[in-house]
Regions:
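Surface-exposed peri-terminal alpha-helical interaction modules
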Residues: 1-299
Length: 299
């Protein structure tokens, strides 16, 4: 990281979160919690201008080629800033021909094109690739319910990934291999972990706080001329690997293939490669059926 990148990252982890938290407390105390107008305008202006200043400095510096991980992290920080501006109605794609965040759009598009991803934050920035400093990772606010939401989403995502990796390891072995059974058990156990994490999230999350104070940061917004949907917790390859290898979905199904095409650029490049490879593989369900049809002894 350059010193300017580090300064922006420090701001995202501290002042940025403090300003968002202060605004959320103002909104939540209001009778109409959806109405964010006319509250905390001084905080909104500070957030807008401080973020713009950091980003303009990075644009002027022009040296964002610090390696993939550093670029990916910087894209997340720019994306967090743009998402917060959208949440606080400092931008609104319904009223704009293009994003008014000119500097942020320019930097996000430069980074997105270099990385092969959409030019906004993705779920990986908050989940699987969200580095903690002294135990504290990046988020939009300091609210407990955002922390709970990110914690359990991240746990569930990694459980899905464990299940997907176990299924992928069965492919070179074949369905009749004795160790394939062990891998299927590992996949089953990982999916049970997903259910457990979802149940715990349901029990612990304040749904009002989540709906009014966390969910709005995932709204669609424009980057340059184009509007991009918000990040989705399913924007990683593992969940689709499970669908495809278990035969629950098919890559040649028009509806499902459209879903895959739409999400590709929301995933990190290594996930894109895994999913592309999986789309051409025979499902385990088809392999089991073929083994039975040909008289396989232990499918």
């Amino acid at each position: 990281m350059t010193s300017n990148t580090e300064a922006f990252d420090y701001w995202i982890r501290n002042d940025f979160k403090q300003m968002n938290t202060a605004l959320e407390e103002l909104y939540f105390a209001r009778e109409d919690r959806n109405d964010v107008t006319g509250l905390g305008d001084d905080i909104k202006t500070r957030l807008l201008e401080e973020g713009r200043s950091f980003i303009k400095t990075l644009l002027d510096e022009g040296n964002t080629d610090e390696g993939f991980d550093s670029q990916f992290d910087l894209l997340g920080n720019v994306g967090f800033y743009m998402a917060a501006c959208r949440r606080h109605e400092l931008t609104n794609p319904a009223n704009e021909h293009k994003s008014p965040l000119v500097e942020a759009s320019a930097l996000a598009m430069q980074l997105g094109a270099t990385l092969g991803m959409i030019p906004r934050f993705s779920s990986a920035h908050l989940e699987t690739h969200n580095r903690a400093d002294a135990g504290v990772y990046k988020s939009f606010t300091f609210l407990d319910d955002e922390r709970i939401f990110i914690n359990y989403n991240t746990r569930a995502v990694f459980a899905y990934i464990r299940a997907a990796e176990a299924l992928l390891h069965t492919l070179p072995l074949g369905v009749s291999h004795s160790v394939t059974y062990d891998l299927l058990v590992a996949a089953r156990d990982a999916l049970r972990d997903v259910n457990r994490f979802n149940d715990e999230l349901f029990d612990k999350l304040d749904t009002d706080r989540f709906f009014y104070c966390v969910r709005p940061y995932y709204k669609p917004h424009k980057v340059g001329l184009r509007e991009y949907r918000g990040a989705n917790a399913g924007d990683f390859a593992g969940i689709n690997v499970i669908d495809l290898l278990l035969g629950l979905c098919r890559a040649d199904d028009p509806y499902y293939s459209q879903l895959l095409v739409d999400k590709f650029l929301f995933m990190r490049p290594e996930d894109q490669l895994v999913l592309r490879d999986c789309m051409r593989r025979k499902s385990l369900l088809d392999s089991f059926l073929e083994s039975l049809a040909t008289g396989g002894e232990t499918p």
